[in-house]
C-alpha cells in the first residue's frame, strides 16, 4: 500500500494533457467494439496502462460476459489504485461498447470538431469519449504521481444493450466505492445524484 500523506488543500495541480485526451478519444473511436465485441478496446486500454507503468496486478477483467445473455468476448475492465492519502474510494467509469452503426468509424478532426470520414458510420463518442476521459485521468495520476484517495477505474461492457456489464459486475472487485462518476452523455451542466435503496 502506498504511504499515506496529508493532502495540502491549497496544492496547485498541473493542467491535464488535453491533447493526449483528444488523441485517446480519436484512437478509441476508431476501434470496432459493438456490444459483446469489446475485446480490442480492452486490449488498447490495457496496453496503454501497462506502457504507462500501471502494475499488471492492478489491471483486471471480470467474467461478467459469461453471465450475460448471449455472452460476449470479454468482461468488464477494472483498475484499482490504493490511495496516497485517506479518503473514501472513488469510482470513475465509462462503458466500452458502441452501437453497431459505429463499427468502422473513421474519426478525423475538422477545425475544432471531430467528424466521421465515413458518413455511413457514427463516431462512437458514446462512450469512447468517456473512456478517453477516464483513461487520461488515470494516466495523469500515475505519470505525474499525483496525490489521490483510493480509486477504482471501471470500463463496463454491453451498456448499450441493457447495462449488462454493470449489472453483472462483481461488486467486490470494485473495492466498495463511496462516490461514483460516470462519463456517459448528457449536458455538462447536468448532474444526476442518485442512491440505491
Segments predicted by a language model, with ranges:
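N-terminal capping segment at the start of a domain
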Residues: 2-39
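General structural feature for long, well-ordered alpha-helical segments within catalytic domains
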Residues: 17-24, 37-45, 75, 88, ...
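Buried hydrophobic positions in well-ordered alpha/beta secondary-structure cores of metabolic enzymes
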Residues: 32, 49, 79, 92-95, ...
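A non-catalytic alpha/beta surface segment that caps or lines the substrate-entry region
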Residues: 34-84
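Short, acidic Gly/Pro/Ser/Thr-rich loop/turn segments
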Residues: 36, 86-87, 99-101, 161, ...
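General beta-strand structural signal in soluble alpha/beta enzymes
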Residues: 58-62, 92-94, 115-117, 153-155, ...
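Catalytic-core environment of secreted peptidases
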Residues: 77-125
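Acidic/histidine-rich catalytic neighborhood of metal-dependent amide-processing enzymes
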Residues: 119-197
Amino acid at each position: 500500500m502506498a504511504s499515506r500523506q496529508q493532502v495540502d488543500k491549497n496544492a496547485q495541480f498541473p493542467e491535464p494533457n488535453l491533447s493526449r485526451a483528444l488523441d485517446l478519444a480519436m484512437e478509441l473511436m476508431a476501434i470496432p467494439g459493438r456490444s459483446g465485441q469489446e475485446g480490442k478496446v480492452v486490449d488498447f486500454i490495457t496496453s496503454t496502462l501497462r506502457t504507462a507503468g500501471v502494475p499488471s496486478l492492478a489491471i483486471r477483467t471480470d467474467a461478467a460476459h459469461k453471465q450475460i445473455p448471449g455472452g460476449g468476448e470479454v468482461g468488464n475492465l477494472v483498475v484499482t489504485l490504493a490511495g496516497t492519502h485517506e479518503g473514501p474510494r472513488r469510482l470513475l467509469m465509462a462503458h466500452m461498447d458502441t452501437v453497431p452503426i459505429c463499427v468502422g468509424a473513421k474519426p478525423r478532426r475538422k477545425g475544432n470538431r471531430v467528424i466521421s470520414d465515413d458518413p455511413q458510420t457514427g463516431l462512437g463518442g458514446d462512450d469512447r469519449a468517456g473512456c478517453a476521459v477516464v483513461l487520461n485521468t488515470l494516466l495523469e495520476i500515475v505519470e505525474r504521481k499525483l496525490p489521490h484517495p483510493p480509486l477504482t477505474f471501471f470500463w463496463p461492457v454491453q451498456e448499450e444493450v441493457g447495462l449488462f456489464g454493470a449489472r453483472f459486475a462483481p461488486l467486490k472487485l470494485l473495492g466498495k466505492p463511496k462516490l461514483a462518476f460516470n462519463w456517459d452523455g448528457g449536458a455538462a451542466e447536468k448532474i444526476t445524484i442518485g442512491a440505491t435503496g
